[in-house]
């Protein structure tokens, strides 16, 4: 919501209140409509100024992150400002191997040369991903600073990781996030992450880059 829209809504409410006062007071006293009109104008001015001061000027936080948002976007931005309850349980990713394959050793049949364990060399693409720094996950709409920090703590630091989530992974993260988990599908984190990982931009990511959204 923009400040101008907030001011306009306050003055509209004040105008309605002034009309109501005019209708109820027009028949009182000797002046009738003139007295009602005077009281209606006074109500409009005082009530409107009070509403603008209380609603629009005394609550600047309404305009810091919600500029340009309407409808469901404004409701989601309001949810972002509420304290987040993160339900964290378990660990992410595949479980580490607890044992390694052992080669049976038979007495009297020791090999002439020492055994050398051969490990597969990492693929260049995988090595490049590890070397790359973490992405700014707040450029994905629906991920605020607290959720971004939590995802980083769980090992999710890049767009391509979120872009690779399948439905089962989405459900797992949604359960861990608790009431905030619905944002994953509502804001299409996976679709946004695919676009950002490919070097594209969204309207939200551009606002983050400009510093309009924290």
UniProtKB/Swiss-Prot annotation:
Record's function text: URF2 product may be involved in the transfer of iron-sulfur clusters to the NADH dehydrogenase complex. It may also be required for the assembly of the NADH dehydrogenase complex.
Protein known as: Uncharacterized 22.9 kDa protein in nqo2 3'region
Annotated source species: Paracoccus denitrificans
Recorded superkingdom: Bacteria
């Amino acid at each position: 919501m923009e400040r101008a829209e907030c001011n306009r809504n306050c003055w509209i409410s004040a105008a309605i209140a002034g009309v109501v006062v005019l209708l109820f007071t027009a028949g009182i006293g000797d002046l009738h409509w003139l007295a009602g009109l005077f009281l209606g104008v006074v109500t409009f001015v005082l009530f409107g100024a009070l509403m603008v001061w209380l609603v629009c000027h005394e609550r600047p936080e309404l305009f810091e992150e919600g500029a340009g948002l309407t409808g469901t976007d404004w409701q989601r931005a309001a949810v972002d400002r509420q304290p987040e309850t993160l339900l964290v349980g378990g660990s992410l990713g595949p479980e580490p191997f607890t044992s390694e394959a052992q080669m049976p050793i038979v007495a009297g049949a020791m090999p002439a040369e020492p055994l050398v364990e051969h490990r597969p060399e990492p693929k260049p693409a995988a090595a490049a991903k590890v070397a790359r720094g973490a992405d700014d996950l707040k450029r994905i709409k629906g991920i605020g600073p607290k959720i971004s920090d939590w995802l980083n703590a769980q090992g999710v630091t890049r767009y391509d990781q979120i872009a690779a989530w399948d439905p089962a992974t989405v459900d797992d993260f949604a359960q861990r996030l608790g009431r905030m988990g619905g944002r994953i599908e509502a804001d299409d984190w996976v679709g946004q992450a695919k676009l950002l990982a490919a070097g594209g931009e969204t309207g939200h990511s551009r606002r983050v880059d400009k510093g309009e959204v924290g």
